[in-house]
Regions:
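Calycin-type beta-barrel ligand-binding domains and close structural analogs
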Residues: 28-44, 52-160
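C-terminal motif of bacterial Sec signal peptides marking the signal peptidase cleavage site
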Residues: 23-26
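Bacterial N-terminal signal peptides that target proteins for export
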Residues: 2-14
Length: 160
């Protein structure tokens, strides 16, 4: 492998790693989007997922009727649907940290159920200072059409 290809591969890996950290590792909000789940676990989301480049693994399991447990990059997260109108949000809580903060993520599953796309909410649009779920919901509704609301996409393919 020549040096430019090696540099490109390392940059691609760093980009994927940063996206993953943004989606799950950046748990920075004090409260979930909604105080309780808005729907039950979706069966098609359960399973093992691998990032498009094959370097990142995400395991999604049912914890309770309406709650998931996620294993990603050695960390555990609890997640549940926090849908707002037509937008499929998920409140993701970091279970490894003492402060147990939340990340806000929107997801999309391909029609064939083989590709899961995640995007985290941009904290420059939705400030970390939001202290209650009602104000979070209001801000998300207010910014629903704001193209800056979400970060870059991160895609995972379902393992067989």
């Amino acid at each position: 492998m020549n040096s430019s290809l090696l540099i490109h591969a390392r940059l691609a890996f760093l980009a994927v790693l940063c996206l993953c950290l943004v989606c799950f590792g950046a748990c920075q909000y004090e409260v979930p989007i909604t105080s309780s789940p808005t729907r039950k676990v979706e069966e098609r989301l359960l399973g093992n997922w691998t990032s498009a480049d094959g370097k990142e693994k995400l395991k999604v399991r049912r914890l309770e009727e309406s709650t998931y447990v996620l294993y990603y990059d050695g960390d555990l997260f609890r997640a549940y649907h926090s849908d707002i109108e037509e937008t499929p949000f998920v409140s993701v809580q970091d279970l490894n940290s003492n402060d147990r903060k939340f990340a806000y993520v929107v997801w999309k599953l391909s029609d064939d159920g083989k590709t899961l796309t995640l995007r985290s909410v941009n904290d420059r649009v939705l400030p970390k200072t939001s202290k209650d779920s009602a104000s979070v919901v209001a801000l998300l509704k207010q910014n629903a059409r704001n193209p800056e609301l979400f970060g870059e996409e991160m895609s995972f393919n379902k393992e067989k």
